[in-house]
UniProtKB/Swiss-Prot annotation:
GO terms for biological process: translation. GO terms for cellular component: ribonucleoprotein complex; ribosome. This is Large ribosomal subunit protein bL9. PANTHER family: 50S RIBOSOMAL PROTEIN L9.
């Protein structure tokens, strides 16, 4: 068994800065050549501390960025132009991908379509709200204005 310090997050093994014990072949053939880990040494404790400090700083920065984007998203109304009939019924429905594209087109930053939660199917023009998960701890509510395309 080889004792290693992870330098990157490895699925099923741990996060950067974790000290793990793995089989020699896994360490020699996968983790070490790809730079995912360093061999454990007595001076490795300092490396572990610096890796964990860098990870904490990145996590703090990502939370702050997500909070800033959430504030920007909540303060603006996003307009979606969709093909619709004369009665206001849409030809299809508004999907999370449509909302993500409209947010990016409005200049409010890129969001992942998988993080958009629509409360119900949007099948007619009008005003709606959608929830967006920007981070593990941060979410925003977007006001949507669905209008008929000309």
């Amino acid at each position: 068994m080889a004792k290693l310090i992870l330098t990157h997050e490895v699925t099923g093994l741990g996060a950067a800065g974790d000290v793990v014990e793995v089989k020699d072949g896994y360490a020699r053939n996968f983790l070490l050549p790809r730079g995912f880990a360093l061999t454990w040494t007595k001076g490795g404790e300092k490396q572990v501390e610096s890796i964990k400090a860098a990870r904490a700083a990145r996590a703090h920065a990502s939370v702050e960025a997500a909070q800033a984007q959430a504030q920007a998203l909540s303060s603006k109304k996003v307009k979606l132009e969709v093909k619709a009939g004369e009665s206001g019924r849409l030809f299809g429905t508004v999907k999370p991908a449509d909302v993500a594209a409209a947010v990016e087109a409005a200049g409010l930053g890129a969001i992942d379509k998988r993080n958009v939660e629509l409360p119900n199917h949007i099948k007619s023009v009008g005003s709606y709200t959608a929830n967006v998960r920007l981070h593990e701890d941060v979410s925003a509510v977007i006001d949507l204005e669905v209008v008929a395309a000309k």
